[in-house]
Amino acid sequence: MAELIQKKLQGEVEKYQQLQKDLSKSMSGRQKLEAQLTENNIVKEELALLDGSNVVFKLLGPVLVKQELGEARATVGKRLDYITAEIKRYESQLRDLERQSEQQRETLAQLQQEFQRAQAAKAGASGKA
């Protein structure tokens, strides 16, 4: 009985460890998006300071290409919208993973108690024999 519970406990621990890896990966992805959001907000602020007489370039591969100011502002705005939506998606994913992780912790605690009871019962049975 104790061996069966131990195997089940080991499987649940592996699930928990995978959830923790996924959680860490999602947090890392969200942090990268936050950095991109900050960077793009700075670009948006800089573009707001320009007027029609200024020349704007964008980097395409190794080449700088002239770009209309309005087009540059629109591109940055769309990028900000996309990044914001991705951050919301990551936050939702993080909430789900945290909820699953908490449930997994509870499952592990229950299995650990079962295992300890089984070990105690086994020790009691072998002590009587």
From Swiss-Prot:
| A biological process from GO | chaperone-mediated protein complex assembly
Per its UniProt entry, which superkingdom is the organism in? Eukaryota
Cited CDD domains = Prefoldin_6 (cd23161)
Return the protein name.
Answer: Prefoldin subunit 6
**Assembly with partners or alone:** Heterohexamer of two PFD-alpha type and four PFD-beta type subunits. Component of the PAQosome complex which is responsible for the biogenesis of several protein complexes and which consists of R2TP complex members RUVBL1, RUVBL2, RPAP3 and PIH1D1, URI complex members PFDN2, PFDN6, PDRG1, UXT and URI1 as well as ASDURF, POLR2E and DNAAF10/WDR92.
Cross-link Glycyl lysine isopeptide (Lys-Gly) (interchain with G-Cter in SUMO1): residue positions: K66
Keyword Chaperone listed: yes
Keyword list, A-Z: Acetylation, Chaperone, Isopeptide bond, Ubl conjugation
GO cellular component terms listed in the entry, alphabetical order: cytoplasm; prefoldin complex
Q: Which residues form a coiled coil?
A: none
Which family does the similarity line name?
Belongs to the prefoldin subunit beta family.
Cross-link position, Glycyl lysine isopeptide (Lys-Gly) (interchain with G-Cter in SUMO2)?
Answer: K66
Q: Which Pfam families match?
A: Prefoldin_2 (PF01920)
Q: Where N-acetylalanine occurs, residue numbers?
A: A2
InterPro entries recorded:
PFD_beta-like, Prefoldin
Q: What does this protein do?
A: Binds specifically to cytosolic chaperonin (c-CPN) and transfers target proteins to it. Binds to nascent polypeptide chain and promotes folding in an environment in which there are many competing pathways for nonnative proteins.
MF-aspect GO terms: protein-folding chaperone binding; unfolded protein binding
Q: Does the keyword Chaperone apply?
A: yes
Chain positions found as N6-acetyllysine: K21, K66
